[in-house]
Regions:
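Flexible, low-complexity linker and terminal segments
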Residues: 57-252
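Thiamine diphosphate
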Residues: 1-75
Length: 252
């Protein structure tokens, strides 16, 4: 649960420096509208703060697929990976194709390694390594099948959406007969952002609406990205007061 990760945040902030052997996936479910929680914090902020790759599923199938991808990425990069859901996605139902069930790995022998002791001498090297790893993940995010455009990409109006908002906007575009005039960038690997793929989507747009649960993390990054690359377009969202940072999105 999102507030539970607050309790684990002290060791998590060190663990991203140390790295892991094998795989470690942190599954965190946020609670927009506080249906059973004391706050509605956005735990994607931990991904940005500590340096965690972060997946954001929008459907039951993506919950499974992204979890598998997260374990694989964790093993490949030697670092913990986050899967961030929200109440609406966590409570969803759907037909899920499981794919191959892998055999269990055999027993492993524990090896004491002082490189995993979080002392300053190690931390100095580990921080540099973490920064390099996160930079190397940008092209991975660019190539991720979870980051893709639904509908035409060369429209003047676009939407960037993640989590449950993906489902709402795709339904709205279809029901309003806008499938040929609105392109939707479906953001599944939310951190680090797929910078090149997003820039390609932004180019040629007059207006882009950003839909994300809770804080405008993606929206702010898109504005910085557009300014850095000399793109002149209007980016609408929570930072422009067109949407609220309060509560969850609904189909209405």
């Amino acid at each position: 649960k999102h507030v539970g990760l607050n309790v684990a945040s002290d060791p998590l902030g060190t663990l991203t420096y140390l790295g892991v052997r094998g795989s470690l996936v942190v599954y965190s479910a946020d609670d927009p509208s506080m249906f059973s929680s004391q706050n509605e914090q956005d735990n994607r902020q931990y991904a940005r703060l500590f340096g965690l790759p972060c997946f954001e599923p929008a459907t039951a199938q993506e919950m499974k697929d992204m979890t598998v991808a997260a374990f694989a990425l964790s093993a490949q990069m030697g670092m913990p990976v986050m899967v961030r859901a929200t109440t609406r996605v966590a409570h969803s139902r759907g037909v899920v194709e499981l794919g191959d069930i892998r055999p269990k790995a055999g027993p492993r022998h524990y090896e004491k390694d002082y490189a995993f002791v979080p002392l300053p001498g190690n931390a100095v090297r580990h921080h540099k390594r973490l920064v390099e790893r996160m930079r190397s993940l940008v092209p991975v995010s660019d190539a991720s099948p979870f980051n893709r455009v639904e509908g035409p990409a060369d429209t003047r109006l676009g939407v960037v959406a993640s989590s449950a908002a993906v489902n709402y906007v795709l339904d709205a575009v279809k029901e309003c007969g806008l499938s040929d005039t609105v392109g939707v960038f479906r953001l599944g690997m939310a951190w680090p952002l797929p910078e090149n793929a997003l820039l390609e989507f932004l180019r040629g747009k007059d207006t882009v609406l950003v839909l994300e649960e809770l804080e405008p993390l993606v929206e702010e990054a898109l504005r910085a990205m557009a300014q850095k690359n000399g793109l002149t377009l209007t980016i609408l969202g929570k930072g422009t007061s067109d949407l609220s940072t309060l509560y969850e999105y609904t189909p209405a």
